[in-house]
Design a protein with these regions (language model features):
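Cysteine-centered motifs
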Residues: 6-7, 12, 45
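Bacterial N-terminal signal peptides
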Residues: 39-51
Length: 463
């Protein structure tokens, strides 16, 4: 109402007399006419005020970007500088909030109001040079006892292992070997055989093909797929040909599933992706009904998508650049992080993937998310963390860690474990926020509010 009165006052000053009181000198203009004109102006002002309020609310809605587009902003929390690469989550203490597991430690979630993430050791992990024996972690109930266990694999350590959840605090988790394997750098969780139970697939099985592990039975069952020519740096799972079956994606082509449980696959050497990251993602980028690919150069510069064109014998692929500004794009993830109902692409730079020998090893660390225009196939980049301490190691975890309704991001790497808190919904108290911000001085700053003497511009004659 106060805004309406101000609007009417301004209108009285700005509208010409002809509009407010009739034509000058026309004394026959009735009082009723004046009242009607004034009422019309009042309605216009109210509508303008309500429109302005509506626009203001749209602009100030948390997570709202320019033009009303959904946009997410993140604050980075460095939980520790411990050697880490793989990362997963589970509720370790039963408080209803997911905790972060990475390497030998788990980090206790402080809850909805924020605070310190306390570190606890729950297992032992070996380190060779600067490589930790933990290039990937997945929470899976391996022994079907109702408690999630942790499955891991690594580049320089023999085997794929699972760590048994003792369901008791303060007890070290027992280590079990699933299979003998070297150079198992990364993997992907997906339901490969369509039984409704997530499986794991790994690249670099003794340089002689891939393995996928079925966890539906009493004991994990290991399946071997392909040979050395089909294997490589990177792996993914997607239905390439639209037959409803999960196919396997490698840097050298794809394995069409005929019957996964019986080991029947057809090889299609359709592409060469060099050292792709994990995972190679299958996604219909331009919404044309065909499965496209998204991949990053794990040890060089570049983030790309391959457009699938044609089908059957005429199927071919066209590479299109998404972003070539940063290197070591070793981990990717599709997830809705801005709350618009559509998945965004998460990508970031890994630190010292090859001991500092990769191109751009010491470029600034970055993590971005990309909105995908499904009509044109265009990608728009938004920052998550730029030139900070957070980089993308070998995995992204996207989950509502603080239970406030938006999706947060967790990463681990050689610069430590990071919780990237989504501020689209922020329920952390002001007092806690101020503890987290870098500024720790009292207000006002020394000298604040004092008059500052204006210096004369250069060349001014001295008095």
């Amino acid at each position: 109402m106060r805004g309406t009165l101000c609007c009417l006052t301004m209108a009285c000053k700005s509208y010409p007399a002809q509009m407010m009181y009739g034509i000058p000198g026309n004394r026959k203009a009735s009082a009723m006419t004046h009242r009607i004109q004034f009422a019309i102006l009042a309605l216009l002002c109210v509508a303008t005020t309500l429109s302005a309020v509506s626009q203001s609310e749209k602009k100030t809605t948390p997570g709202g970007g320019p033009g009303g587009l959904a946009q997410a902003t993140f604050v980075s929390h460095r939980l520790g500088t411990d050697h880490a690469e793989g990362v997963t989550t589970m509720d370790m203490n039963g408080d209803g909030f997911p905790d972060i597991l990475s390497g030998a430690y788990w980090y206790e979630n402080p809850g909805a109001k924020g605070g310190e993430w306390k570190r606890h050791q729950y297992r032992e992990v070996s380190i060779t040079g600067e490589f930790i024996a933990d290039c990937g972690e997945w929470a899976i109930d391996v022994n079907h006892d109702g408690a999630p266990d942790v499955v891991t694999a690594a580049w320089q350590t023999n085997g794929v292992w699972w760590y048994e959840n003792p369901k008791q605090a303060g007890v070290e988790w027992k280590k079990h070997q699933i299979t003998d394997s070297y150079d198992t750098e990364g993997g992907v969780m997906a339901d490969i055989n369509g039984d409704g139970v997530p499986d794991l697939i790994f690249a670099h099985y003794n340089h002689s093909g891939l393995i996928w592990i079925d966890f539906a039975g009493a004991e994990p069952k290991v399946h071997h797929v392909g040979d050395k020519e089909m294997d490589g740096h990177g792996v993914g799972v997607a239905d390439i040909d639209g037959d409803g079956l999960a196919d396997i994606l490698t840097p050298n082509g794809w394995l069409k599933q005929v019957d996964a449980n019986k080991g029947n696959w057809e090889w299609h050497p359709d592409w060469k992706l060099e050292d792709a990251g994990f995972p190679i993602i299958g996604f219909d980028v331009n919404n044309d009904g065909k499965m496209d690919l998204i991949y990053g150069e794990g040890h060089s510069y570049g983030l790309y998508w391959l457009e699938q064109i044609g089908e059957g014998d005429t199927r071919h692929w066209v590479r299109r650049a998404i972003d070539e500004s940063f290197s070591q794009v070793h981990a990717l993830k599709l997830a809705d992080v801005d709350g618009d109902g559509e998945p965004e692409l998460l990508a970031g730079k890994r630190y010292r993937g090859h001991n500092g020998k990769d191109p751009g090893s010491y470029d600034p660390l970055v993590i971005y998310y990309y909105k995908i225009d499904r009509k044109t196939g265009a990608f728009s980049r938004y920052p998550v963390s730029v030139n900070g301490t957070a980089g993308a190691g070998t995995q992204f975890v996207v989950e509502d860690m603080d239970k406030d309704g938006d999706m947060d991001i967790v990463v681990a790497g050689k610069t430590g474990v990071h919780f990237l808190e989504n501020l689209k919904v922020d329920r952390v108290p002001k007092e806690q926020r101020e503890k987290e911000i870098l500024i720790d001085k009292s207000w006002p700053f020394p000298g604040e509010g004092q008059e500052v003497k204006q210096e004369d511009p250069p060349g001014t004659p001295k008095k």
